[in-house]
UniProtKB/Swiss-Prot annotation:
Pfam families: Mur_ligase, Mur_ligase_C, Mur_ligase_M. NCBIfam families: murC (TIGR01082). Pathway: Cell wall biogenesis; peptidoglycan biosynthesis. This is UDP-N-acetylmuramate--L-alanine ligase. InterPro entries: Mur-like_cat_sf, Mur_ligase_C, Mur_ligase_C_dom_sf, Mur_ligase_cen, Mur_ligase_N, MurCDEF_pg_biosynth, UDP-N-AcMur_Ala_ligase_MurC. It comes from Thermotoga petrophila (strain ATCC BAA-488 / DSM 13995 / JCM 10881 / RKU-1). Coiled coil: none annotated. It is found in: Cytoplasm. GO terms for biological process: cell division; cell wall organization; peptidoglycan biosynthetic process; regulation of cell shape. It catalyses: UDP-N-acetyl-alpha-D-muramate + L-alanine + ATP = UDP-N-acetyl-alpha-D-muramoyl-L-alanine + ADP + phosphate + H(+). GO terms for cellular component: cytoplasm. ATP binds at residues 109-115.
């Protein structure tokens, strides 16, 4: 079958395209711009067009699109004209799973699902279970970064941003939490959002939930939490190199967890994984070994650069909700106790910024300095009055030293550089390009430019 993927450079879309390509289908696609994923897919022999055009056409049998691709996209218009079936990525992904008929491990929720999915995959690989993995991020130990083909169970990250996720029926499901992100896709109805989690839980053999989550804790056959749940934490210690935690089960000391990845949130992610595998009757000794070896996912507190001479760090992180940002900054302050923390934050989606107005500033005030950029639209229509300046204004009202930079290409030129500083480039958009340009500029100059943010301060 010949399949045309519209938006093939997306992290979720490219994983599905890889699966179909490696299973013998004739795959090609298009993307709005060149990305690391499009370059990688090309190296494997997948033809890719950039940008979108009605001429990007090899007479496919099927067209797959992401929700971000609008119906007036020229390739979608042509597909309709030529009566070629068009399917949403998530719908098609469910069809793949039905076709595979394998044991399914799924992770969904607002925060932490990529890292938790990666942990589950890493454990199964360590146990020699040969999983097929679909990941919403890049993990070095997966053959293709966000995808690996195996002959064992299927592990996948299930995006709750689309209500259709409730139509899946994995054997085992971890719900990290449910904070109402993407509520606009549920008609801004919290009850409809809650019902989607309830529906998928009814279709699942074993559900693991965060005991302290208001919307989904009651859905868990097994729960985990800080002080509440089947699996809880008695104590935790952390250093720059590792962190340890004592885990209790039903109120009794059960085991010790060691992690190389930093952050209290990652202890909770690992606790969910322990709850899952213990409930399934796995020997926990190799599970704990795998978790201790786990090295994380790209753009999750990823140290992109360190100059030991000046003790300057540049870290990339995908955090884009207030809770994720709060977790990130708490981790940064724990790991870098004596360094200044500067956050460069790119808000992601107008709808999220409008809904979370004020919450971003509350999370960001944990940093020493904050630079806010304009919103990365993620193909949303711009909303009047919704701008990154909202966060900047809120930070200023909280008495925080903050700056606003409207044009992203200018960002790395105006970020103040000083010794003993950690620069966190944060967001789910294209802020990573600014991170790289900042490092390039720093390496070429090795100077300390004066602050030139002028009236934006």
């Amino acid at each position: 079958m010949k399949i045309h993927f519209v938006g093939i450079g997306g992290i979720g879309m490219s994983a599905v395209a890889l699966h179909e390509f490696l299973n013998g289908n004739d795959v090609y696609g298009s993307n709005i711009e060149e990305t690391e994923r499009t370059a990688y897919l090309r190296k494997l022999g997948i033809p890719i067009f950039v940008p979108h055009s009605a001429d990007n056409w090899y007479d496919p049998d099927l067209v797959i699109k992401t929700p971000a691709v609008r119906d007036d996209n020229p390739e979608i218009v042509r597909a309709r004209m030529e009566r070629v079936p068009v399917e949403n990525r998530l719908h098609y992904f469910r069809d793949i799973l039905k076709r595979e008929k394998k044991e399914e491990f799924a992770v969904t929720g607002t925060d932490g699902k990529t890292t938790t999915t990666a942990m589950v995959a890493h454990v199964l690989k360590h146990l020699k279970k040969s999983p097929t993995v679909f990941l919403g991020g890049i993990m070095d130990s997966l053959e293709h970064g966000n995808y690996e083909k195996g002959n064992g169970p299927v592990v996948y990250e299930l995006d709750e941003s689309e209500e259709f996720f409730s139509e899946f029926s994995p054997n085992y499901l971890i719900i990290t939490n449910a904070r109402g992100d993407h509520l606009e896709n549920y008609g801004n109805s919290l009850s409809r959002y809650r019902s989607a989690f309830e529906k998928i839980s009814r279709n699942t053999d074993l559900v693991v939930t965060f005991a302290e989550d208001e919307l989904t804790s009651h859905l868990g056959d097994v729960t985990f939490g800080v002080k509440k749940g089947t699996y809880t934490l008695e104590m935790r210690s952390a250093s720059r190199a590792e962190q340890k935690a004592v885990v209790e089960k039903n109120g009794k000391r059960y085991l010790e967890l060691k992690l190389k990845v930093p952050g209290f949130h990652n202890v909770l992610n690992a606790l969910a994984v322990i709850a899952l595998f213990d409930s399934l009757g796995y020997d926990l000794a190799p599970v704990l070994e795998a978790l201790e070896e786990f090295r994380g996912v790209h753009r999750r507190f990823s140290i992109a650069f360190h100059d030991p001479e000046t003790n300057i760090y540049v870290i990339d992180d995908y955090a884009h909700t207030p809770d994720e940002i709060r977790n990130l900054l708490q981790t940064a302050k724990e790991v870098f106790e004596n360094e200044k923390i500067v956050v460069i934050f790119q808000p992601h989606r107008y709808t999220r910024l409008e809904r979370e107005d004020g919450n971003f500033a509350k999370a960001l005030q944990l940093a020493d300095e904050v630079v806010v950029t304009e919103v990365y639209d993620a193909f949303e229509e711009r909303k009047n009055g919704i701008s990154g300046k909202m966060i900047w204004d809120s930070l200023k009202s909280l008495g925080k030293e903050a700056y606003f930079v409207e044009k992203l290409p200018e960002l790395e030129k105006v970020i103040p550089v000083s010794e003993n500083t950690v620069f966190l480039f944060v967001g789910a958009g294209d802020i990573i390009h600014s991170s790289r340009r900042f490092v390039e500029r720093y390496q070429s100059s090795k100077s300390s430019p004066s602050r030139v943010l002028g009236s934006n301060k």
